[in-house]
């Protein structure tokens, strides 16, 4: 009898254990069949069934019954092929020609420094009945494939948006989100576009002429100077005015602050004669931007010798990573601004002819007269090249050392602008 009870107990325990295992294995699986993997990318995370009513994949015949709201719209991005170059036809013709022909394309008498815009377009197709109305679109454009940093955001009521001032030689990612009535959204897949390598990167800022990125140029050792850190431009407010008369528009301010992310403005205009136009402590961009007056004399036969104290101050600011992104300018963003651009570029290893090319592009700005290579050769380039060194980079480094700029500041600027740590 006892033997029978023990056998019955074992059988009962086995039955209970089997039932328990079945319950555990079956938990949640009645709603989540293990379907073969497929590529439609529209599967419900609850039941693993396809939620796209337009999907015709063989393994997607069975559709989700409602765990996820079906896609209301399909957004298809227009492909941007080739390498995008936003220079105008006139700018490109000039860049393709010799340095000495620049003034035959632009002579500094009118505003020609703005570039073309790129239209990003898409198509929107309703794929369900009674879909909520599209209110507007949000477009995100970034160099980060995860869309977690450096994102430019645009809004549009139409199926396109115009963008400009893109970095050169750069891969961009973009996507579009439709914002629907009621708060729902639909987001497109990600598309990619690539910009051409042709410099300089010219920037469109409403109310400011002659805006360019010092980055993008290749150095003699193949390094590319970082973009998005240091911008040269013309003035933001009217020079020599007794009261501050801001010339950059609200649209221009928004672009500098929201898209370029400007943190500091270095003003090279004279203070003693009020060339700064009444500015004292606050940038025309607002109190969030550090205003750094570095008054340089423009009436001197050698801009380096005549402004050595300010050059030391300027490179102290340039050596501080917290100052970036930074804009710097004089009155029209050409001569004193051109000197600092030449010194920074030369220090980083940008070839001499490339530095001339960048300087001469100021002729496309409204600068009140033309400039040639000889303008800066006689003023400071020959002076720099008299310094010790085999290369222009070495000569620029030693010239600035002799001017009084500490080596640690020069090394810091090179590191910031190229990502190459000196002595590493």
Describe the role of every protein-language-model region:
Residues 1-12:
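Bacterial N-terminal signal peptides that target proteins for export
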Residues 25-32, 63-327, 339-424:
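Cys-dependent protein tyrosine phosphatase-like superfamily
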Residues 332, 336-337:
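Ser/Thr-glycine-rich phosphate-binding loops at phosphate-binding pockets of nucleotides
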Residues 20-23:
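C-terminal motif of bacterial Sec signal peptides marking the signal peptidase cleavage site
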Residues 9-10, 52, 226, 330:
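A general, composition-driven signal for non-globular sequence regions
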Residues 17, 29-64:
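Thrombospondin type-1
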């Amino acid at each position: 009898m006892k033997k029978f009870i023990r056998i019955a107990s074992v059988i009962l325990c086995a039955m209970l254990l089997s039932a328990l295992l079945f319950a555990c294995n079956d938990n949640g699986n009645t709603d989540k069949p293990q379907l073969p993997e497929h590529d439609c990318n529209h599967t419900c995370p609850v039941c693993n069934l396809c939620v796209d009513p337009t999907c015709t994949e063989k393994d997607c015949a069975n559709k989700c019954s409602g765990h996820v709201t079906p896609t209301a719209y399909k957004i298809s991005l227009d492909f941007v092929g080739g390498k995008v170059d936003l220079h105008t036809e006139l700018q490109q013709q000039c860049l393709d020609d010799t340095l000495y022909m620049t003034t035959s394309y632009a002579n500094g008498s009118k505003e020609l420094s703005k570039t073309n815009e790129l239209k990003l377009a898409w198509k929107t197709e309703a794929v369900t009945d009674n879909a909520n109305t599209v209110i507007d679109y949000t477009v995100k454009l970034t160099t980060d494939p995860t869309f977690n940093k450096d994102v430019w955001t645009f809004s549009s009521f139409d199926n396109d948006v115009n963008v400009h001032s893109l970095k050169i030689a750069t891969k961009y990612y973009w996507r579009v989100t439709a914002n629907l009535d009621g708060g729902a959204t639909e987001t497109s897949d990600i598309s990619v576009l690539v910009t051409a390598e042709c410099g300089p990167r010219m920037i469109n800022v409403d109310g400011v002429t002659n805006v360019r990125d010092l980055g993008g140029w290749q150095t003699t050792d193949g390094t590319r100077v970082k973009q998005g850190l240091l911008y040269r431009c013309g003035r933001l407010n009217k020079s020599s005015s007794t009261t501050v008369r801001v010339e950059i528009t609200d649209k221009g301010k928004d672009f500098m602050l929201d898209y370029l992310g400007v943190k500091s403005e270095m003003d090279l205009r004279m203070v003693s004669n009020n060339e700064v136009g009444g500015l004292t402590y606050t940038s025309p961009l607002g109190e969030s931007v550090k205003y750094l007056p570095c008054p340089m004399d423009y009436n001197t036969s050698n801009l380096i010798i005549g402004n050595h104290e300010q050059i030391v101050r300027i490179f102290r600011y340039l050596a501080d990573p917290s100052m970036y992104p930074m804009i710097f300018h004089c009155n029209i963003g050409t001569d004193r601004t051109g000197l600092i651009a030449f010194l920074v570029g030369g220090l980083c290893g940008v070839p001499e002819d490339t530095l001339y090319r960048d300087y001469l592009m100021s002729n496309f700005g409204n600068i009140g007269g033309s400039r040639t290579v000889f303008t800066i050769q006689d003023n400071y380039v020959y002076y720099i090249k008299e310094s010790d060194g085999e290369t222009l980079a070495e000569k620029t480094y030693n010239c600035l050392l002799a001017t009084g700029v500490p080596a640690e500041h020069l090394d810091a600027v090179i590191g910031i602008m190229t990502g190459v740590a000196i002595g590493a």
